[in-house]
């Protein structure tokens, strides 16, 4: 499968993703008790401990019953290969965030909003939110449609 990355910082600087001033943890919907997997996160990616709610648990795939997956990806091929496998690890009300490089980032990619959206929709999920993860990465949130949620693995 894909590798894990990312870290936590205790530097005291809050990761204010994008331009809204809202901490990333809040933007992507991390709540108390969430089970989260960071997949292919860049080595310099971090959440500040003070922005995380209590009892958040970071786990490694192939863990199941995940509330949030944040998947960093640079190629359409990798996204197509791993999207459905990762989405199958979600709880019925879980979400998968796909993070791909912004055009302005200088990071090589063949992904765009339209390609990311198409792959997610083709996998049976629906996109419901977009955000700036940071100065390099855009993120698109996918969830299962309400009518499909009873058939998804539950906690």
Placement of each model-derived feature along the sequence:
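Conserved beta-strand signature within the Rossmann-like core of class I S-adenosyl-L-methionine
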Residues: 93-101
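Short acidic low-complexity segments
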Residues: 55-66
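Short, Lys/Arg-enriched N-terminal segments with co-localized hydrophobic residues
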Residues: 3-15
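Class I S-adenosyl-L-methionine
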Residues: 26, 124-155
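Conserved Class I S-adenosyl-L-methionine
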Residues: 110-129
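N-terminal, charge-rich interaction modules
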Residues: 12-49, 55
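A short glycine-rich, Lys/Arg-flanked "PGG" loop and its adjoining helix->strand segment in the class I
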Residues: 83-92
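A short, conserved alpha-helix within the catalytic core of class I
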Residues: 77-83
């Amino acid at each position: 499968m894909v590798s894990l990355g990312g870290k936590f910082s205790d530097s005291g600087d809050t990761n204010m993703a994008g331009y809204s001033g809202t901490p990333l943890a809040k933007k992507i919907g991390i709540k108390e008790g969430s089970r989260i997997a960071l997949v292919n996160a860049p080595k310099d990616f971090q959440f500040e401990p003070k922005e995380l709610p209590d009892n958040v648990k970071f786990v490694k795939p192939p863990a199941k019953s995940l509330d949030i997956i944040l998947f960093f990806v640079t190629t359409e091929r990798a996204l197509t290969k791993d999207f459905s496998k990762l989405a199958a690890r979600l709880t019925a009300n879980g979400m998968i965030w796909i993070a791909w490089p912004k055009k302005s980032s200088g990071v090589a990619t063949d992904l765009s909003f339209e390609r990311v959206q198409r792959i997610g929709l083709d996998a049976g999920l629906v996109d419901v939110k977009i955000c700036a993860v940071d100065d390099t990465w855009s993120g698109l949130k996918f969830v299962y449609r309400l009518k499909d949620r009873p058939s998804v693995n539950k906690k």
